[in-house]
């Protein structure tokens, strides 16, 4: 650390607002760059406090903890830059008033990802470091696509780091790479709408918006603001990739040069560079629209050369959907998005498709736990919004007993009606907004059961589900009313499923 520079009285003073994972990374980076630090958080014991104290001496940081519902404007005194945590909504208190005061004083407001973008620009100038950069956003599927894209890239012999919302924070990963003298060939960033609000100068080779459905309306205020936050990413990318099935993402590229747009979807692709699904003789395939057979060598272009004309091309079958280890149509679409991102780097199909076959998915995302009595148990605890749960219901291809409920975050639950009517035998309701979901689903005629906790939910679901069906935990809600986070909720589900198996004498 640049402790000498950090302690200089004339060094710039940076205010870190919010001390979660990204706040700690930003604080460490700013200290490394020679800034003085002031840190403020609404909590007395924010999650990143111990981590920051472990790497920075107490004298290097001015702490203001337990600020509660109000940040004192005096926090801005002497500050040249304010780094905002993605956990604090800029349009809501306690951050809104302080941010307005910062802007009126001419203090720059930015986020950790913007600092990362500027760090890459500095490294390009100082060390001629010019990595490729791919970025992923969307309501659902971000982590799966980010992790899978990294795996595809590494299978082709390039080094890659996945960072951002997926964890670790982008700056934390960059500092680790610098310290290890192991800067990667490619960065793959998962970016939330929160992070994009404070990012302005990222330069991506390609970026994808996977989908936009209701989520985080308690943070953004309305769907328009939420979609606009996602759309910001495509304006910072050379190639914009969107979901043809999602009108909101298609609208984001309405004014973009078509040569710089790629798309994926459930239907057959029509233009060179697009991807989709083909149902042939009862077998679903991942397909790409290519100008030539995919086993021919790729003609390399100069980096800044415009992409070729996107005319109608030749359909290439890549692999059967059933060959994927990740389940559901939504995951087939995630696979297409990852392939498109990696394909922008002009990587060959062969290694990527082999890596795609091997990819087993991420924890708590439509993850198969086990079968008991012919019933599959699926952990989709990461399904924290209505869109994710609809995707899981429609993608599994099984009748399910759904376990849903938790903190609803101000969502409209009505989009669940159609998917539940078509795919669910029953719904077991848990958590604070379980009753609200039940109220919406009453008109479907699907059986509704209320459970006090996960143990009861799993047991009641097991009583209802029939052989060949699935018990699906996909809550459509956040978890904090009952659990530490969604991984904790998923782990409790897995434990209860394993306990059920033991009780029934089924041991793996």
Swiss-Prot record:
Q: EC number(s) per UniProt? A: 6.3.2.9
Respond yes or no to whether keyword Cell wall biogenesis/degradation is given for this record: yes
Superkingdom is: Bacteria
Q: Some GO term, biological process aspect, for this entry: which one?
A: cell division
Pathway membership: Cell wall biogenesis; peptidoglycan biosynthesis
Instruction: Offer an example of a GO molecular function term for this protein.
Output: ATP binding
Question: What does the sequence similarity comment in the record state about its family?
Answer: Belongs to the MurCDEF family.
HAMAP family under this entry? MurD
Function (record text): Cell wall formation. Catalyzes the addition of glutamate to the nucleotide precursor UDP-N-acetylmuramoyl-L-alanine (UMA).
In its UniProt entry, what is this protein called? UDP-N-acetylmuramoylalanine--D-glutamate ligase
Task: Supply the source organism for this entry.
Answer: Bordetella avium (strain 197N)
